[in-house]
Amino acid sequence: MKIVLLLFLMVFQLSFSKELLLSGAASLKEYLEKNIEEYKKIEPDFNVTLNLGGSGTLKKQLERGGDVDIIFLADRAYMIDLKENKYIEDEEVILENSLALIKNKKVTSENGVLAIGDPKYVPAGAYATEVLDKLQPKNYSFVYAKDVRSVLSYVELGEADFGIVYLTDTKLLKNSEIVKVFDKNLHSPIEYSIGIAESSKNKAEARKFIEFLKGKDWE
């Protein structure tokens, strides 16, 4: 009898839990973790499983039937495409960012290996490519990373001399430093857009969480 009652209580509790699956750009890691914890103070039964990675990779996962409630990418063009092809209900820009050139503190030369995200899948890499196409630097060889946080890791670990990352990522630097923040005229607007998957079974809770995020900047 006790076992039956315990199982009943577990099922009852689970039925009232609010579990969302959120696919988000790697650069959103700290932002999302912080705001999920804040939201839990309002909604104690709220739970989120984060799937972080390159925006292009996350987009493909959704297109291939991946299980997701909310998708939050660093390239609005990806989100517009998802909306037009009916993978998401709508999309809305709620954050913006800038690009920065960083270097390992041990680097003394202006020449070296420059890490950027793979522009085919990583918006930060695509924005970086726009900057490089306009500035035409001749002093770098290139290495491509799976997401912008991998770029940061390459530079921090000395596996690359320089890297181009989002300005918000530079808060995590320990062994590296900012060389410059690029003028926004050198690249397309860096806009983070969020939306609810058409396939989501938790749309009401997803909308509530997105409304909460709208009032939250990077800080």
What are these regions (language model features)?
Residues 5-17:
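Hydrophobic h-region of N-terminal signal peptides that target proteins for export
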Residues 17-38, 42, 56, 64, ...:
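Exported/periplasmic ABC-transporter solute-binding proteins
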